[in-house]
Amino acid sequence: MQVWTYLDGRWLEGNPAIVGPMSHALWLGSCVFDGARAFEGVAPDLDLHCARAVRSAEVMGLEPQLTAGEILEIAQEGRRRFARDAQLYIRPMFWAEDGFVAPDPSTTRFCLTLNEEPLPQPRGFAVTRSQYTRPLPSSAPTDAKAACLYPNAGRALMEAKRKGFDNAVVLDPLGNVAELASANLWLVKDGVAITPAINGTFLNGI
C-alpha cells in the first residue's frame, strides 16, 4: 500500500516514526484528525474536512498553526503523488507533543497522511445494538473528531463482530439512536433519506 505523509515541510513515504513515549498525544490522548476520500479524480468536501480538523484542534485546546486553506493545498499536493484515479484516504492530524494531563498548546504539531484505500463494494450488512453508548458533551469532546473517542467505538465494533455481525448501532445516553460504531447511520424509506438528529453526543457527518 502506498502511503505519503507531510510533516514539517517534507513528504515522507511509508509509516514514519512521528511520536514517542513522552509525546502527550500518545499517552494522554490529545490527537484529533479528519478523514476525506478521493476517487475518480475528485475529492468531495475535502475543504470541509480540512476546516473540521482545525475546529477539532481548537476544541481540544490545541493551537493549529495552519489554516484550512493551507491544509487543503497540502492535501492537493499529496494527491499528485498518486495516480489521478487512485482511491485515497486523506487524513490531516493535529496533536500536542508536551503537557501533563492538559496539553501544552504551544507544542501543537501537524501532519497529513494520504494512503491508498479502495472504496468498499456496496453490499448488505448485519448490525446489532451495542451495550456501549456515546458520551455526553459534558463528559467527552463530542464536538471534535478526537482520537480519544474511538476506543469506545472500537469496543462496540469488536462486540458486534464477536456476535457475528458486521457493525453495531450505538445509542446516546438517553436511548436515542446515534450512529454506527464506525460510521454515520443512514437509511432510506419511501424514497426519503433518514439519519439521526444531531444532539451533541456524536459528530455531524460531512
Model-flagged regions — what are they?
Residues F82-R84, V101-P103:
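An exposure/low-complexity boundary signal
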